[in-house]
C-alpha cells in the first residue's frame, strides 16, 4: 500500500483542452506547463496535450527538459531569458523568448547568433510587473524590428492582473490599452490566460495561454472548475494508518490545538507537510473518507494528519482518504487553508508517488 499518491487523469486533461478549444475556437492554444506542469509532471502533461499548439514555461531548464523528452512544438520562455549566455541555447533548441526589459533588448542587439530568435514583446498594459511601459513601447518595437537577431514578424503579448475579478474595470482597461498599442501590427498577439479565456472573450486574439484551468482548477474565487465544465486532473490520496478512540476532553497532535468535545474516533492519514500538504491547514479543513467529508482535527505534522471520523465511524486501517481531487475540489480545500489551489498542486514534494491513468 502506497502512502501519498497523486493520480493524474489524462482523460480529464484531454477533456479540459477540448473545452478550452471550444471557448476560443479561432485561437491557437499555448498550454502553460511551468512549475512542473503545475505539479502534474511537466513531460507527461506536454506529451498528452496533443491538441495544444505550443507550450509556455518559466525557466529555460523546463524548455530543455521538454526538448530532451521529444517535444517538438514551439516553446516560449514566458519571463524571457535571464542572461545573454542563454541566447545560443535558445537558438540551438528552437526556443522562443519574451522580451520585457531594456537589459534583454540590449543583449539581443549585441549578440552574435547563428539564426534569429522568435521574440514576443511583453507590454505592461497595467499589471506593472513585467513589460515595456506604454511610453517605451514604440522604442522597443523599432529596435526589435531593426535587430537582425529577432525573427520577423515580431509578436506581442501582455498579462492581466485582475482578470479573475469580474466586477473590476481593470481588465477592460488593460485590453483596450494593449489593442490600441498593437493595432495594425503584423505579428500575432496574445493576452488571455485562464481567466481571460473564460470571462473576457475580447482578449482572445490570436493565442490563448491557459494554465490552471487546463488542470481542472478554477481561476475564480467563487466558482469551481466543475461549475465551469472542467474536470480535476489531479486527485491526491493516501490511506488511514490508524483509527483511534479519543475521549471527550482529550487533545490530539502537536500543541494539543484540537480537543475533542465528545468521545469519537480519530483517523490518522499518512500524509503531511513533508509531502507538501500545508502545515497551515486549520482544524475543520475537509478530507474525503468513505463517501463523506470529515474535518482535520489537530495540527498537520510532517508525515501524518488526523481527522475526526465521528463516534459511530466504521472506517478501518487501509481505507482511502482523498485530500483533493474528484470527490473534493482543491478550490474548497484551499479556501479553508487560506491559500489558492495553484499553491496546493504545485507544492507537492518528490515523496508523493505520481500515477498517470487513462
Curated annotation (Swiss-Prot):
Kindly state a single biological-process term from the GO annotations of this entry: D-alanine biosynthetic process
Q: What is one cellular component GO term in this UniProt entry?
A: cytosol
Q: In which pathway does it act?
A: Amino-acid biosynthesis; D-alanine biosynthesis; D-alanine from L-alanine: step 1/1
Q: Modified residue N6-(pyridoxal phosphate)lysine is at which positions?
A: 34
The protein's UniProt keywords, in alphabetical order, are: Isomerase, Pyridoxal phosphate
**Could you give a GO molecular-function term held by this entry?**
pyridoxal phosphate binding
PROSITE patterns documented for this protein = ALANINE_RACEMASE
| EC number, UniProt record | 5.1.1.1
What are the required cofactors?
pyridoxal 5'-phosphate
Q: Does the keyword Nucleotide-binding apply?
A: no
Q: Where in the sequence is the active site?
A: 34, 254
Positions with a binding annotation for substrate: 129, 302
Q: Kindly state which reaction or reactions the protein catalyses.
A: L-alanine = D-alanine
State the top-level EC class.
isomerase
Function statement? Catalyzes the interconversion of L-alanine and D-alanine. May also act on other amino acids.
* The family this protein is said to belong to: Belongs to the alanine racemase family.
List the PANTHER family hit by this protein, alphabetically: ALANINE RACEMASE, ALANINE RACEMASE, BIOSYNTHETIC
Q: What is this protein called?
A: Alanine racemase
Q: What is the lineage of its organism?
A: Bacteria, Pseudomonadati, Pseudomonadota, Gammaproteobacteria, Vibrionales
Amino acid at each position: 500500500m502506497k502512502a501519498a499518491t497523486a493520480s493524474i487523469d489524462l482523460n480529464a486533461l484531454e477533456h479540459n483542452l477540448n473545452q478550452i478549444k471550444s471557448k476560443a475556437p479561432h485561437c491557437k492554444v499555448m498550454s502553460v506547463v511551468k512549475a512542473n506542469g503545475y505539479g502534474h509532471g511537466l513531460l507527461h502533461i506536454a506529451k498528452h496535450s496533443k491538441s495544444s499548439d505550443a507550450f509556455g514555461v518559466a525557466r529555460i531548464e523546463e524548455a530543455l527538459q521538454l526538448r530532451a523528452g521529444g517535444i517538438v512544438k514551439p516553446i516560449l520562455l514566458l519571463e524571457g531569458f535571464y542572461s545573454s549566455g542563454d541566447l545560443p541555447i535558445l537558438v540551438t533548441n528552437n526556443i522562443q523568448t519574451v522580451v520585457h526589459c531594456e537589459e534583454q533588448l540590449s543583449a539581443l542587439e549585441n549578440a552574435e547568433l547563428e539564426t534569429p530568435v522568435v521574440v514576443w514583446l511583453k507590454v505592461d498594459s497595467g499589471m506593472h510587473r513585467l513589460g515595456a511601459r506604454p511610453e517605451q513601447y514604440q522604442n522597443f518595437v523599432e529596435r526589435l524590428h531593426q535587430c537582425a537577431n529577432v525573427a520577423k514578424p515580431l509578436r506581442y503579448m501582455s498579462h492581466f492582473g485582475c482578470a479573475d475579478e469580474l466586477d473590476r474595470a481593470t481588465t477592460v482597461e488593460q485590453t483596450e490599452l494593449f489593442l490600441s498599442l498593437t493595432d495594425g501590427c503584423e505579428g500575432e498577439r496574445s493576452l488571455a490566460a485562464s481567466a481571460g479565456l473564460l470571462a473576457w472573450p475580447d482578449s482572445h486574439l490570436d493565442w490563448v495561454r491557459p494554465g490552471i484551468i487546463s488542470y481542472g482548477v478554477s481561476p475564480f474565487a467563487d466558482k469551481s472548475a466543475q461549475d465551469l465544465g472542467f474536470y480535476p486532473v489531479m486527485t491526491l490520496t493516501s490511506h488511514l494508518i490508524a483509527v483511534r478512540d479519543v475521549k471527550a476532553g482529550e487533545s490530539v497532535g502537536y500543541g494539543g490545538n484540537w480537543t475533542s468535545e465528545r468521545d469519537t474516533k480519530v483517523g490518522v492519514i499518512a500524509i503531511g507537510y513533508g509531502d507538501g500538504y500545508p502545515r497551515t491547514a486549520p482544524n475543520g479543513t475537509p478530507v474525503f473518507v468513505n463517501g463523506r467529508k470529515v474535518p482535520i482535527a489537530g495540527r498537520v505534522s510532517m508525515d501524518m494528519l488526523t481527522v475526526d471520523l465521528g463516534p459511530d465511524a466504521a472506517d478501518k486501517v487501509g481505507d482511502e482518504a482523498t485530500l483533493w481531487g474528484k470527490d473534493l475540489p482543491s478550490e474548497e480545500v484551499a479556501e479553508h487553508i487560506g491559500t489558492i489551489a495553484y499553491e496546493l498542486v504545485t507544492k507537492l514534494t518528490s515523496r508523493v508517488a505520481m500515477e498517470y491513468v487513462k
